[in-house]
Amino acid sequence: FRGTVVIGEGAVDEAPELYVGEELGTKQGVELDIAVDPLECTDSVANGRPNAIAVIATGTKGSLFQAPDMYMNKIACGPKAKGAIDLDASVKENLSRVAAKLGKSVPEMVVLVMDRPRHEALITQIRSAGARVRLITDGDVAGAIAPSLPDSGIDLLMGIGKSAEAVLAAVGIKCLGGELQVRLAPKDDVQKQVLRDMGITDIEKKLSIEDLAKGQDLTFTATGVIDGPLLKGVRYTSDYCVTHSVVMRVHSGTIRFLETQHQLK
């Protein structure tokens, strides 16, 4: 294959490897877009907190949204609540709609939110509506995918996070049949000009999962580093370590969970 990194570790002058625009593979065969985060949640790993993964998503050329390095407003739900979320609706309205789809009351709902000062008002609105909040310090990708996992205990993700993580999550959510809506949130005129330079003129457009990850030829692969809602972290014994991974494909709907032993000696 001939792959091009469309979401990676930064621009060519910011990262020695996996930089945006880097070509990977044999440079022959099918052309692919590659989105990669070799370690999502570096702070979590450094501080022993949960929810760290290594993740890569692929799609045919032109299928993955080439997200600029800025924030997005996000809302994500699982397959059973598909069609109920709306980024333009109020927090209370989204909670009521999703609860109705899931056959729950709003007080039974659990919403995942990143623990950031920018989310203080959002957290207040969720709790005022009667729902519960689950705070995470990091882990936007696994966090957005969590509502699509049947045993995660998470019904919704809400809040503001990085655009690169939104694209990675979009592929995973699409594999699982969930829904994600986002909107770019440039912080100043400089970032707005960056968007215009990229050809993005409708900054206020509500982007669907199909805008972020087009078509069916998409794959999502992740391995857990530290335990999180999606995967277990690495386990060590005296002779080997055990990793837990997931490999998903949109076209076939295949979801494979792998437990692998790696010999250390």
Q: Where are each of the predicted segments found?
A:
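Acidic beta-strand-loop-alpha-helix segment within the catalytic core
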Residues: 55-135, 228-235, 241-264
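Gly/Ser/Thr-rich active-site loops/lids in small-molecule metabolic enzymes
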Residues: 131-141, 154-156, 160-161, 165-196, ...
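Short acidic loop-to-helix transition motifs that present clustered carboxylates
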Residues: 11-13, 118, 137-144
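Anaerobic metallocofactor- and corrinoid-dependent redox/one-carbon enzyme cores
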Residues: 78-83, 174-178, 182-265
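General beta-strand structural signal in soluble alpha/beta enzymes
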Residues: 5-9, 34-36, 45-47, 66-67, ...
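Short glycine/serine/threonine-rich phosphate/pyrophosphate-binding segments
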Residues: 38-47, 52-54, 120, 141-145, ...
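Flexible, acidic active-site loops/lids enriched in D/E/S/T/G that coordinate Mg2+ and/or position polar
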Residues: 1-61
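Solvent-exposed alpha-helices and their adjacent loops that cap or buttress functional pockets
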Residues: 23-29, 46-49, 101-106, 125-128, ...
